Amino acid sequence: YDPEHNIIRSVMNGSAGPNLDATMEDWGGSDFFTHWVGKNVRGDTPLNLQATSLVLTAFGLSQEAKYRDWIIKYTDGWIDRARENGWNFPGNVGLNGKVGEDWPNPAEQFPGYVPEGSDIYPWAGGIMGWSGWGGWGFVPGSVRMGLKNAYLLTGDEKYMRAMDRQLQNLRDGVKIGERKNGRPVKVNGGWQRAWMAMDLYLITMRPEYTWYMKDWKPGRWQPGEGTYGMGWTRDWIAYLSGRYPEFPENMLDWALQRTRRRIAKIENDESKDWERKAELRHNNPVTTCALSMLTLGAREPSWRGSPVIGRLRYFDPERGCAGLPPNVGALVDKMDDNNVWVTLVNLSEDATRTVVVQAGAYAEHSLGTVQTDDGEPRELNDQAFAVVLRPGCGQRFRIEMDRFAQRPSFAFPW
């Protein structure tokens, strides 16, 4: 990290520091990967915003302000560059802090990915940049992670507004250059799907961030492996608003199907070792998306290292660990800006269970009142509370909270 220019000096970093010159050894493998050989790895890239999750972990464990301050400073630097670039996060920053410094003609460095003869803007270059393979996904995906981490630490709406501006640009088509005939070269990547934009609404609960939900009809998605959670996340939002009451059962059925399907892939695997490395996340039979949505009130975090941003987290005080106690089920069925509704049930026929309910995955929210469907509200002014469930008993709770009012911590609530 270069504090003077507020950049990470390379896209490839390790114990020996930043790698400023790519070699064949760095990009070895099939032809699909070796087209990167000789491309410039010097300077910063939006992909490095994923490093904020590493620093967030350090803050969550230590509570040292220097880690929080670094995430805010580094992320704000990228927001400043995006603002100066029409709210498009540039794909590269040179070692001198200037955008586009080491990518004078991205079209020459990525033949085949842009129309021949195009004049691509230097800011659109970069490893996994706008003008390269998959840039429409890698750039905003990494930006999304950095902005979410900064929002988790601060609750400052500017981070969500910056994400919204970039995603709306993608929806309309990001202009990254011009063809010889003067027509623009645009990137949108099929953004009618807008699968990244869902975080905007789920984190803020602001109606203006539902533009990606236009004309959505609940239940129309088909279970598959390549949807990035787009369909079921939209259906989950519909369920939370009362439009799709069958969602929990359908989602559970889908999750079981996915686990069975992936176990079958493992049992019948004929792939090569080098192929298997890239396919691990598609073959993992552990399926957590249904549990994240329906018990935590959280969208499943991305495989890139994103933190969980949700309403609730559970702990078992008897075993001294995180998670729901044995035989205890939880179902979040409604959320708004300041409240979450959850039903807790003890399925055991002979054992009483105690579950500690925390506001936020990392205690980033403050509890206000808690009320059962048939009871009076109780003022808590804390970050967690305990519920004792008798055998075969359950209760629905409305939990009021002031969201993102506390600094996130990985500490358990005892």
Q: Where on the chain are the PLM-derived regions?
A:
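Glycan-recognition and catalytic cores of secretory/periplasmic carbohydrate-active enzymes
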Residues: Y1-G375, E379-W414
